[in-house]
Amino acid sequence: MPTTRNNIKLLYDTDDADCAAIIESLSEKNATYLRRRRLLEGPSAHAKDLVIECAEAIKQDSSPALLDRFIAQVSENATEFEILTLLVAGWFALRQEQWQVTEMLGREVVSRDHHDLMAQRLIDAARETSKDLETETDRWLRTRTCGAPFREMETRVNGEVHFCCSAWQPVPIGRLETADEGGFWNSDRAREIRRSVRDGDFSHCSRWHCPQIAGRRLPARTEETQSLKLELEEGPDRVILSHDRSCNISCPSCRTQLINLPHKETERLNQVFEDHLLPLVSKATKIKVTGSGDPFGSRHFRHLLGRLTQAGPAGRRIQLHTNGLLANERAWNDLGLWDKVSSVWVSIDAAEADTYSVLRRGGDFNALRKNLRFLGDLNARGDIDTLRLDFVVQAANYREMPAFVDLANEMNADGVYFLRLRNWGHVTPQEFKGLDVCSSDHPEHKDLLEVLADPRMAWSGVDLGSLNSI
């Protein structure tokens, strides 16, 4: 367990009281750091600034020898310390050009919480041997812009709202229940995130997990984008609905057991949709369901899809993200999806039945293939605009990536999307380290790089997404 004030003295007082005092002072500020990560201390109170402020204060009162002892204590016992302590030690290590120590401390934080942007930036800076934290990506971002904070929103299971996936941009802009009051779309946090994008610092965006950043796909800044307003009159043009985790299978990449909301909670979410979301989605041109579970395995999302096909303007507004096991002709008929769906993204994580049975617990590979043929036929006939197959890369499946490309071609898919495994808090940090083959310190990471060099991975339909950063 991470160190707390109750056991610091037991661990360190007898050996190094000065080092223990530093650790205790950081422990007292750890909760503040976690709040700052979400801009809960105010839009100008950034988490990165607190790390550097703490480091500067410690440096003023400490000898070089004490700082060396502090870095050594934390790095030798990294699993015992809280996040802020690890990051401050990582910052000192970076400034001293201890690149491997910096990266190790950053990875300890990421293994606990993949949302921590400071840890990601420390790792990237260490890889590029940059003492001041600035990387090539930061320099590139100063020339780029992103439209998501100006036209998109995503709902989350905990009732919070983000501009996009919380792994890409971890700061929530507000809560669902304030939607009808305009309470999140132009909140202080929303305006701060828009400012960071407009000004090119992208302070609240993940350089790792955002596929637009990792894949270098953001459009260039222009005079027009540099003068974008931070407070918007129009609501979102694209709405991503990810507030129900119900699913018909239990994939170990995101959960430990089957999740299916009880009827009472489903009824509550149905009412939330009617009261707070329907006015928003009725004006949106694109509506994605879902980034949290399965649109067909959730009673709530099935209700929602039925409402969407009945309400709003005609046309293909719906984007479906599904495991594919229930995405069949019956679903299209029952929910009135014909000529209402623009894109279908199918999460599979395997190219072989044996691997699929492990990584998609409760799934049936033969049933999936049958439904993929149905979706592929829709795509070939032009009944949907896009079909994509998705694959979360991890130690158990990375060798099947080229075969997954073959599967996509067989099923008339337009492309494949590979993404890094994330720790959503469902596994221990140590377990995550064993699964995260994308990490450069994983024992099979070099084998992954060889797989990425397979000629099939050069297909124009391959999108490496967040893997581009490796």
State where each predicted segment sits:
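Radical SAM enzyme [4Fe-4S]-AdoMet core and its adjacent flexible, acidic
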Residues: E28, E56-D61, D68, R95-M104, ...
